[in-house]
Amino acid sequence: YKEEVIGKDSLDVEVIWETLYNKARPFGQQGIAMNALSGIDIALWDLNGKQLKQPISRLIGGRFREKLAAYATGFYRLDGKKYPETSVEDALKFKEEGFTAMKLKVGFTPEKDIEYIRSIRKAVGPDVRLMVDFNACYSQAVARRIILELVPENIYFYEEILTPEDMEGYKALRNLTASYMAAGEEIFGKIEINNWLKNGALDIYQPDVSSAGGITECKKM
């Protein structure tokens, strides 16, 4: 990519993106080639914003809103800590700080995950919105069981409960529950996400700007 970027005008960000994308075609439109392209694209937008003394949000067309709702996340497992006790303490601290939504990290075993989520729900009460990130670790059969057992906990969305290859599984789970199905960190580019959209596989799409093609591509997704 170096020779296609060094010495070029950073304002030609769309031209540079297309040039790099076409050059990467033999290596596929996913994985490390797209990761590298994404990083270059983000850097170009950052440079343009600094040179023009404007936020990138304005450069890509402007802001529809000035505020966004925030949720607390984290809840990572640390050696030497007891769980779910440590996470219950963290959740209560977040609630005291004013957070009304939290996203939990799970994906250990179905039994541990169910117990963990129930413990957090019991601690924070029914008015806190809970989302759960499974890091793409379960089969459709196991995910179905988890979702059905957690119906009373009123989970707002299930994130990456299946592997990114299992589009049909996501479609089935989406029709199983009133909770939203979320994924997308491993969906690369507008062409791939269009397949998911056409199949109605998800409720919430979460492309990762650092791997899905950068700001230029994510704006089109």
Where are these regions (language model features)?
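Structured loop/turn residues at beta-strand edges in well-structured enzyme cores
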Residues: 38, 66, 97, 153, ...
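Catalytic core of soluble alpha/beta enzymes
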Residues: 104-107, 111-221
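Short, charged beta->alpha transition segments
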Residues: 55-60, 85-93
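N-terminal small/glycine-rich loop or linker at the start of catalytic domains
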Residues: 57-79, 116, 123-127, 175
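Active-site mouth loops of central-metabolism enzymes
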Residues: 66-88, 106, 133-140, 182
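Flexible, glycine/charged-enriched surface loops at secondary-structure junctions
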Residues: 13, 56-59, 160-164
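Catalytic domains of carbohydrate-active enzymes, especially glycoside hydrolases
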Residues: 90-105
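Metal- or metallocofactor-binding catalytic centers and their adjacent structured scaffolds
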Residues: 1-51
